[in-house]
Amino acid sequence: MLAELSIKNFAIIEELTVSFERGLTVLTGETGAGKSIIIDAISLLVGGRGSSEFVRYGEAKAELEGLFLLESGHPVLGVCAEQGIDVSDEMIVMRRDISTSGKSVCRVNGKLVTIASLREIGRLLLDIHGQHDNQLLMEDENHLQLLDKFAGAEVESALKTYQEGYQRYVKLLKKLKQLSESEQEMAHRLDLIQFQLEEIESAKLELNEDEQLQEERQQISNFEKIYESLQNAYNALRSEQGGLDWVGMASAQLEDISDINEPLKKMSESVSNSYYLLEDATFQMRNMLDELEFDPERLNYIETRLNEIKQLKRKYGATVEDILEYASKIEEEIDQIENRDSHLQSLKKELDSVGKDVAVEAANVSQIRKTWAKKLADEIHRELKSLYMEKSTFDTEFKVRTASRNEEAPLVNGQPVQLTEQGIDLVKFLISTNTGEPLKSLSKVASGGELSRVMLAIKSIFSSQQDVTSIIFDEVDTGVSGRVAQAIAEKIHKVSIGSQVLCITHLPQVAAMADTHLYIAKELKDGRTTTRVKPLSKQEKVAEIGRMIAGVEVTDLTKRHAKELLKQADQVKTTG
């Protein structure tokens, strides 16, 4: 949810910070006070089109900042992770500065991002619906996802089964495409990898060979130093009156007194052990001295061999193991190319089999969607009826993603289909608002009043299905009154149960339904107009709703009417 909004030097707003709560927040006030400016600021904050005209006159830039609180597992967390944006304590701070040149600087949790990134994140946080806005529900490409969310676990399970087969199908299709490349490309490829395999095999590499050779080279290169040091060490220990003799004498002396007490016994054992360790070391030194031999030809061979391995590493892998793995891989590829026809037939047969299985799963997903689409239509008809649009008809149009006849494509009901991650369906919500009128897409609903009610009916069902945390209605109640106005108010309240809702309204019925009522007013400050926001108390709500009813003068009658609306709203909230 949008927890706090800060605006500075934006249009007529000098500086303003507004806190928002859960549930339904309404913004009311006189025309021109700045209600829509606040919504404009929110729209720009989440990636809307900016302009230098938004910068307050005489200032260098406009500054917008919003704090969003998230629930764990919200999809926006994944998007932020992909973009390297750190999100701690499940909070996102979005900021956008707009200069007088029209350029924007955008940040999310302090990280600079592009407008496109800001918009991508914003779409998952806010859904703004105004009289002319295109928003999530009006965009056809979102309808499949919304239908799947409405269908829930049943379609989710079927889709998961389908996607497992689909991934296997895609891999096979890729292998088939690689094998089906032109003869000339295949011939060139075969020549190349045969040469590479011959080069690797002729080297007769062994695992860890390079490490062993480097160790041996180190030893031969330091022959003189190793021999001299070993000889000196051996002489120091083994010559007449050498170190080993002195340690032996010390051990014998301590042995004579070792049974007097425990400390002497331990001391004797320690020196005795040291003697045997040193004696063993001298044997090893002698053996190594006898084996040491300087062989310049061996050193030359090692250098040549290491250089050969180095050249192979540069071409085929960082280690000998990598080179051998690459050799195994291209050996398999050579076999596939040389036996291409056989592999092609085998692969086509497997692809055809998998494709048939996947097509069955795709058809199953499609059928489940169609079943739930009917349930969705029934629910939306009920919602529209409660908004006094009982003559409206809602339906979901299904089209199959078709493939051309010359493609290697699986068949569903005898028709070649194009498989995608989400199945074979193209889904679009359609509506007719009057008897006898044809069904058309949501974006083609002409009447502002009708569009408002249609969107509210759909949103009352989908508000809990959408990923957005906040929904904004900007004067969606235009062109309605009376019982329709009351129905709209109740529907907006219903939407606010599942999502935070901010609503600019001119309808007293909607204002009465608010959990939080913010009054937007203009005031003069240092000879300039600015905007202020005031949360209304219960008594102030009565006065403001009375003003909305009366238009100008608030009378005792309009106050009574306002109290009646508030009482009615409380009853609606209580009964649900």
Swiss-Prot record:
Keywords: ATP-binding, Cytoplasm, DNA damage, DNA repair, Nucleotide-binding. Belongs to the RecN family. Involved in recombinational repair of damaged DNA. Seems to be the first protein recruited to repair centers, foci that are the site of double-strand DNA break(s), followed by RecO and then RecF. Forms multimers, possibly octamers; these become larger following DNA damage. Recruited to foci following DNA damage; probably interacts with RecF and RecO. GO terms for biological process: DNA recombination; double-strand break repair; SOS response. It is found in: Cytoplasm, Nucleoid. ATP binds at residues 29-36. GO terms for cellular component: bacterial nucleoid; cytoplasm. Coiled coil: none annotated. This is DNA repair protein RecN. Its main location: cytoplasm. It holds the Pfam family AAA_23. Disulfide bonds: none annotated. It comes from Bacillus subtilis (strain 168).
